UniProtKB/Swiss-Prot annotation:
Alphabetical list of PANTHER family matching this protein: DNA POLYMERASE III SUBUNIT EPSILON, RIBONUCLEASE T
Protein's recorded name: Ribonuclease T
Quaternary structure note: Homodimer.
InterPro entries: Exonuclease_RNaseT/DNA_pol3, RNase_T, RNaseH-like_sf, RNaseH_sf
Keyword tRNA processing set for record: yes
Reported cofactor(s): Mg(2+)
Cofactor note as given: Binds two Mg(2+) per subunit. The active form of the enzyme binds two Mg(2+) ions in its active site. The first Mg(2+) forms only one salt bridge with the protein.
CDD domains: RNaseT
Species classification: Bacteria, Pseudomonadati, Pseudomonadota, Gammaproteobacteria, Pseudomonadales
Annotated SMART domains: EXOIII (SM00479)
Organism from which the protein derives: Pseudomonas putida (strain ATCC 47054 / DSM 6125 / CFBP 8728 / NCIMB 11950 / KT2440)
Function of the molecule: Trims short 3' overhangs of a variety of RNA species, leaving a one or two nucleotide 3' overhang. Responsible for the end-turnover of tRNA: specifically removes the terminal AMP residue from uncharged tRNA (tRNA-C-C-A). Also appears to be involved in tRNA biosynthesis.
Amino acid sequence: MAERFRGYLPVVVDVETGGFNSATDALLEIAAVTIGMDEKGFLFPEHTYFHRVEPFEGANIEPAALEFTGIKLDHPLRMAVSEESAMTDIFRGVRKALKANGCKRAILVGHNSSFDLGFLNAAVARNDLKRNPFHPFSSFDTATLAGLAYGQTVLARACQSADIDFDGREAHSARYDTEKTAELFCGIVNRWKEMGGWRDFND
C-alpha cells in the first residue's frame, strides 16, 4: 500500500453537519473507513469507525440541515460523544492502520472531499488535537473520480453506475455514505489497475 500512493494511506471520511460552515456549524456525525490492499494489489474497505457527535458549545444548527439528514438530536438512542472523543478514537484507528501498512500519513478520501476535510480540520483546531494523521489539505475526491470513470458526480448515481447497491433511505447517514464511498473508491482504483493503469514496479 505504501508504494501505491507515495506513502499515503487512503482513509474514506464522511461527515453530517448542522450546515455548510465548518467554523460555525455543528459536526453531528463522522465516519471513517480505512482501506486495505490484498496480495494482488487490489484495494478493499477494511475497518469502519463511526460516531454520533455532540454539537460543540455555541454551534449553529440549521433546521434545514436536520431535515435533510434526518438526524434527531434528542433521540434516546443517539448516544453521541464529544468531538474530542470521536476524533481521538478515529485518529487512533487510523494511526494503527498507518503502522500496519507502512504508510507515513493518511490522505482523506471523500465525496466532495473538501467539505469533509474542512469539518475535520475545524474539529481538530477547536479541540487542539495533536498528531492529526491526515494531510492538512490534500485529498482524493470521489465526485471527480466518478465523473471521470462513470460520467456521474452524485454519489447514488455513481454507485449505481458502478453496480454498487445504494439504498436512498440510508443515505445521509455518515456511516452508510462512508462505506458506499469506500466501495466506489476501491472499485475505481481497482478498475484502473485492471486496465493496466498502474503496476507495482517491484513485482
